[in-house]
Amino acid sequence: MSPLASKALRPAATDPASIRNFCIIAHIDHGKSTLADRMLQMTGVVDSRSMRAQYLDRMDIERERGITIKSQAVRMPWELDGQTYALNMIDTPGHVDFSYEVSRSLAACEGAILLVDAAQGIEAQTLANLYLALENDLTIIPVLNKIDLPAADPDKYAAELASLIGGDPSDVLRVSGKTGAGVEDLLDRVSRTIPAPVGDPDAAARAMIFDSVYDAYRGVVTYVRMIDGKLSPREKISMMSTRATHEILEIGVSSPEPTPSDGLGVGEVGYLITGVKDVRQSKVGDTVTTAARPATEALPGYTEPLPMVFSGLYPIDGSDYPDLRDALDKLKLSDAALVYEPETSVALGFGFRCGFLGLLHLEIITERLSREFGLDLITTAPSVIYEVTSEDKKTVTVTNPSEFPGGKIVSVSEPVVKAAILAPKDYVGTIMELCQSRRGILLGMEYLGEDRVEVRYTMPLGEIVFDFFDNLKSKTAGYASLDYEPAGSQDSDLVKVDILLQGEQVDAFSAIVHRDKAYAYGVLMTGRLRELIPRQQFEVPIQAAIGARIIARESIRAMRKDVLAKCYGGDITRKRKLLEKQKEGKKRMKMVGRVEVPQEAFIAALSGDTEKKAK
């Protein structure tokens, strides 16, 4: 057994040969964070008393949902054959929406632990993360987790994993993050096989920013991986992309609580605090160098994450608009992938059009806005980016249905993605049926082992971003897993469906849908609004239209007073006169009356399963 390191190596004085930088990559729910907990405990960084499950997941939302959203970096000491190593572990998210977090973490590592659940086997996200790691030339250590489960079948999945990455099934380590079995062997394997970082200690300092978070008291905390040279406290540093200079107020390592040090040397992973309040000053992927002796060449950065899904966020109370702006600014600090710009809607007032990486990202951001900042928001139905070419050859980029141009349209192109779905072979039929109903085109199928299939489709992103994942899970009893990547765009027969209330368009309910599904969407929305809008003194028609053509209609019946109540018996002409008079009044009222759509109706219509249009 490897003993606890008698003393940890001091940051800034650590020989790069004793540093090991690695991350844990796996599909969602395969036990990354639990394994990280055991490592923290076994290396003695966190004592048993202050240990809690998912120690590194700091956000309430992460803990409640049991998912990791932000990567975390931790330095741990480990002793092997009389030599002490400094292991820098980066815990990464497993969800497809946060793959950019994973790619950033991989760029700061030399090795990766590929973790697979011994009861579930390889899943879509396992493959996606593995390919990311291979692109970064990382040394991969295959590991099966959860071997203590009664349903675990380590021999079968060890063979599957070995055939996937090439190697012998006996090389696949078997651990249990829950009981701690095999974790020491894993730490030994990490120390032995992951290459030490390479860098020039005498060159000009270069450090890569792989994450930055905002701390209310200390400003922006920037996580960096040193490549060359050394950084020390009170040194002036410069960001290579913005040329901004700052002074390092504090520099140190997370282990796992922030621990100040005398600096950072080659290959080390740590944090900097410069007292800057604007996170845009420390962009993820940027290179940090010293102002006195700047490096000439920046490190190759990452590609900026591109938003895939757009949605409007509007405060329910218009006076909260400045608070919403501040809240988004603060979230942007710790979430580089969030993009937003102000927009106004006739129906909803002032708000922001925000770009997200996917639906989970959208859900997490809206939940954080309501929790951390106490905002009540309306979220409009998510949409993707369309390129619309009109007859005069002008191309317009549309992220919001209200920007869809009128007049003759030559073509509309929408983004498509390559989707890979992994599931047990019994569900292939239902999966294909679902994908075809969403305009998917089959690319191919592959059997992984005797009972699991990978089905590959190209599909329009607009069909995936709503409820595709939920439907996929419910049709496959929760066994299927999905991964997708952008694959260009294609021209499609898309139309904008407007919802008219008493002949007036309500922009918040407009949607861009495929022509075949336009009627279903129109019927769904008009039916839903009929239930939600309160009855008026006059009849209110609710119509769905494509351009000037009405495709569906519902009416809200008028409320009417019983004007005949006072006539007891009496002549029919008297009754007719009163009824005609009432009818006349209703007609006049209809001409001048306006329909107020209550806030609740907006929320219910937009948040309800507005997207059941694909049924």
From Swiss-Prot:
Entry's localization field: Cell membrane
Catalysis performed (reactions): GTP + H2O = GDP + phosphate + H(+)
Membrane topology term: Peripheral membrane protein
Source domain of life: Bacteria
Stored SUPFAM superfamilies: EF-G C-terminal domain-like, P-loop containing nucleoside triphosphate hydrolases, Translation proteins
Main localization of the protein described in the UniProt heading: membrane
Alphabetical UniProt keywords: Cell membrane, GTP-binding, Hydrolase, Membrane, Nucleotide-binding, Protein biosynthesis
Gene Ontology terms describing biological process: positive regulation of translation
InterPro entries assigned to the protein according to its UniProt record, in alphabetical order: EF-4 (IPR006297), EFG_III/V (IPR035647), EFG_V-like (IPR000640), EFTu-like_2 (IPR004161), G_TR_CS (IPR031157), LepA_C_sf (IPR038363), LepA_CTD (IPR013842), LepA_IV (IPR035654)
Coiled-coil ranges from the UniProt annotation: none
Gene Ontology annotations for the cellular component aspect, listed alphabetically: plasma membrane
UniProt domain tr-type G: residue ranges: 17-198
Family listed: Belongs to the TRAFAC class translation factor GTPase superfamily. Classic translation factor GTPase family. LepA subfamily.
Protein's recorded name: Elongation factor 4
